[in-house]
């Protein structure tokens, strides 16, 4: 199987989703600005998203897919369906209970998440109401993640990658046409999240039916596969919780800063998640099932080659990407967000965060890939320990960095600790002789750096030619922005070609 083909497919779907996500954020910034209302929505929306990341997305798939691959290799359809039915029954019961409890304790959760919202009280009341509306999203999106994991195991990668598009379409549609029907109008965003999550789930069901894996839940929780997954999920949840606890504490810090800080961080976070999602998430998704399959079959050499291929692809894209984001931070934010109530000051504050986030872009992507390498071996404790250590380091650094850099200090702290996480994981893989920095790898890295340095020179020339970004129509600004990125990208590819790095050589065929 040619892994570059599904990678391109998943990346393309993710790109479409992220572009729609930017359209969504542009509309939110234009209609609602960076205010008490957007702070309330972003905080409320982060809570079900946080729980999703702890209990479903990464954590669940890391434990679930290797076990499912074992069932699949036995080629006993009845056993596979019984296993999936038990998983579905357990998840439905647990998530429904979590949704009910979350709705009941919404105000307390908001106060824990953002104690700065206690004053003014209107901010707390609004956040609580928004959270109660959106809490069922955790149920919908977690079941959608289960469907995605099953489809990925059958090599249906592009279908799950396409599903997040429906959430963005829902938010865009209801924001534009129905915001005037709600008071305050920000409530429309909460309902659009629920509708989008429901469509995400329903969209994948016909494809499960196509592969004959659409099952009904049962409540026989003594299934061996289910018990294995629950046993593995303990360390996985602890590791995922460490990352999310870090985000919670970061939000607590930001809620105590100037009004708008949460929104500035959110918009910068959305921009850095664009390349992380397109490359990091897409690549780790495609790699994970193949890594797990090769490890289960004892093909260690193929496993190592596959991981090396993923890391090289990541470096080729992420190094120039981080440079472009750093130097084009302000123009990108002006072009995408400076409309309506989004001011020059908002642009400046958001750009500061984005520049510091871009310093950690390479490590954000590398950590996802290296974590997948451990999860494919069913070795969950090492990423967990690394996450716990970086959580502690992150929070030790936060007060110091926030004192000097205000809200941007949170981004700098995350970038530094992400690099530490990468070094810890790579050291463990090096000790196991899975990764190594041999002469060929060292030369490859040097060549990528040289190509990037030449690109930086050309990028400075382009920026000098187009020094004013806040005038002109949206189309005019978009064309100028893409021209700068296009010229930089062509320069980078040209230099890689001169240095002997051919992209066609990265068509990897997995055995």
From Swiss-Prot:
Pathway: Cell wall biogenesis; peptidoglycan biosynthesis. It comes from the Bacteria. Its main location: membrane. One of its GO terms (cellular component) is plasma membrane. It is found in: Cell inner membrane. The keyword Ion transport does not apply. InterPro entries: Lipid_II_flippase_MurJ/MviN, MurJ. It is a multi-pass membrane protein. Keywords: Cell inner membrane, Cell membrane, Cell shape, Cell wall biogenesis/degradation, Membrane, Peptidoglycan synthesis, Transmembrane, Transmembrane helix, Transport. One of its GO terms (biological process) is lipid translocation. The keyword Cell membrane applies. Pfam families: MurJ. GO terms for molecular function: lipid-linked peptidoglycan transporter activity. The chain crosses the membrane at residues 25-45, 85-105, 133-153, 156-178, 245-265, 271-291, 315-335, 356-376, 400-420, 442-462, 481-501. Belongs to the MurJ/MviN family. NCBIfam families: murJ_mviN (TIGR01695). HAMAP family: MurJ_MviN. Involved in peptidoglycan biosynthesis. Transports lipid-linked peptidoglycan precursors from the inner to the outer leaflet of the cytoplasmic membrane. This is Probable lipid II flippase MurJ. It comes from Buchnera aphidicola subsp. Acyrthosiphon pisum (strain APS) (Acyrthosiphon pisum symbiotic bacterium).
